[in-house]
Amino acid sequence: ARGYKSCLEMCLFSGDIPESVYHSLIEAVHGAFPAFYDYMALRRRALGLEQLHMYDLYVPVTENPYQGITYEQAFELVFKALAPLGEEYVSLLHRARDEGWIDVYENQGKRSGAYSNGTPTCHPFVLLNHQDNLESVFTLAHELGHAMHSYFSNREQPPIYRGYSIFVAEVASTVNEALLLRYLEKEAGQDRKKGAYRCNL
């Protein structure tokens, strides 16, 4: 850790992350452990297992009331969920959809997964592999978070400040996911199936 007070400081330096932020994150995660353990115990019981393994985390514990969500329906959910971010933000989401910023469906030779790539001279591009399910709705919200982050950064910042670390990048995408989850919780209301399905996320 030459030139640094610690190996931790050295590792955080390139992302411009203060050690206090790192320690706050660790503390917050540790604080959430009891709720996480309760959730895992509930999942284990719901699946009727003596021991829960990593692969069990992907097994649905309830019927899926969200199966068959088309891309168009997914976008409507995302529009509504992200409305708190303001009119300009939502209008840019419309542009992204209408102006071909997004490659939506699987195709031969297309890379799997989902990605967003911002460019300094034009709008961002988003690659999806939409599957008509709730996970794809969250993926759409997540990748649009990256795309909008790049769009605003490129528009508002001089070139030297346009880039950002992965630590910062994931804030915009995770905020979008949190807003989507909050919106879905509100919409589910007393619908037990929709409420219970959150256990699968």
Regions found by a protein language model. Give the residues of each.
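Cation-handling catalytic/transport regions enriched in His/Asp/Glu
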Residues: 1-201
